[in-house]
Every structure is written in structure tokens, then in C-alpha cells.
Amino acid sequence: GQGGLAGWQWMFLLQGVPTVLLGGLAIYLLSDSFANAKWLGAHERAVLEADHRLDAASKPASSTDSLLAVFKNPAIWAFGLIYFCIQSGVYAINFWLPSIIKNLGFSDTLVIGWISAIPYLLAAVFMLLVGRSADLHKERRWHLVVPMLMGALGLVIAVNFATQPAIAILGLTIATMGALTGLPMFWPVPTAMLSAGAAAGGLALINSMGHMAGFLSPYLVGLVN
């Protein structure tokens, strides 16, 4: 460490200070509407405003968009639980994948690193393919459900074939592909179903519930391990 601060404290400062400064600048640099965006041309602005009106018209109308109404909305809590489950799988894999692979019988650090990279490489390809398919077919729900089922199935395979490294790694790969793809495929679903007024508080609550998994999931996996 330097200057009386430990290395991890410097890391927090170096990562946090630019973020806070950028957040302050965003107030002045970002426009609050299409009409005020100076970097958009007149035609681009008109197209975006038309799309925005169509999007708003397709969402359910609501006269109860208060914060209290958000907390009373069962759909928001259901979405929060779904997102919590997705994030639980993601955090568990991100934190524990190398350790799990080591417990399968691999001792060389380099080999563990290469094997750990396989699920993420395939997940990156799968994520692009699923996203492309969702846009092509204009469908979101099943493009979310299938990756989530893959994530659950992959973990079940990995657990039940822990004594067979090849099959266990296959299960972990399927789980990683499903969990990481579920993240980007999740958000269009609640965004499309919530009214404009409910979306702000609703999405914030869903996001907060999901990221509680970042605290709980690694501890739970470690406890089970």
C-alpha cells in the first residue's frame, strides 16, 4: 500500500472516484429527452419520438404509478424473484467455477484456467445467437425461459455426475450458457409489461432484489461446499 492506504483501498478509490465524477458530469452532458439531444438530427429525433410514442401506447395504462403502488404490484415481486434466481446462478458460477473444477480432480492452475474459460466462450456465442433469434422472431418470453431451464438442468447434471469430470464440465458449461444468457434476455420482459410510471420504481426494486443474490449466493454455495 501507499499513503497509509492498503492496496484494496486504493483499488476502491481508483474505481469509485471516476464513477462518481462521471455521474456528476452526466447531469450536464446527457439530455433528458429526444427533443433536447443536440447530437441527433431532425429525422433521427422524429423517428425516435414516434417509436417512443408507440412503445408507450403498447404498455398498460395505470393511474397508480406511485412508489406505494409499485410495492403492492405482485408482478414486480415475481419478476424480482425470477431475477434473484438468475443472479444466484450467475454469481455462484462466477465465484466458484474454478474451485468446482479443481474439486473434479484437476490440480494444474493453467489447466483449471483453460477449462474455466470454455463455459464463458460458449456462453458468449450462445448469448449472441439467442439475442439474434429473439429479435428475428420478435419474441422474448421463451427466449428467457429456455436459457433459465438450461441453467437449472446444467447445475443438476454437474451435481449428479460430480465423479465424472467430463460430464460435470458439460453440465457446468450448459449452466453457464443458460445463466449468462438469461441476464440480457430478462430485462425486455418486465420493461414491456410495466407502464411508464411504474417502470422506474419497479425496475429499481427488481434490480435490488436480484443483486441481493450477489451477497447471499456465494455464501450459500460455500456453506454447501
Can you say where each PLM-predicted feature lies in the sequence?
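Helix-to-loop junctions at the C-terminal end of transmembrane segments
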Residues: 125-139, 225
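A late C-terminal transmembrane helix in Major Facilitator Superfamily
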Residues: 191-225
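Cytoplasmic loop-to-transmembrane helix junctions
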Residues: 7, 111, 139, 198-205
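Small-residue (Gly/Pro/Ala) motifs that create kinks and tight helix-helix packing interfaces
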Residues: 1, 22, 26, 98, ...
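Central mid-sequence intracellular linker of multi-pass
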Residues: 5-67
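C-terminal transmembrane helical hairpin of 12-TM major facilitator-type secondary transporters
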Residues: 136-189
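MFS 12-TM fold signature
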Residues: 15-22, 123, 148-155
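Extracytoplasmic gate region of multi-pass secondary transporters
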Residues: 66-131, 183, 187, 214-218
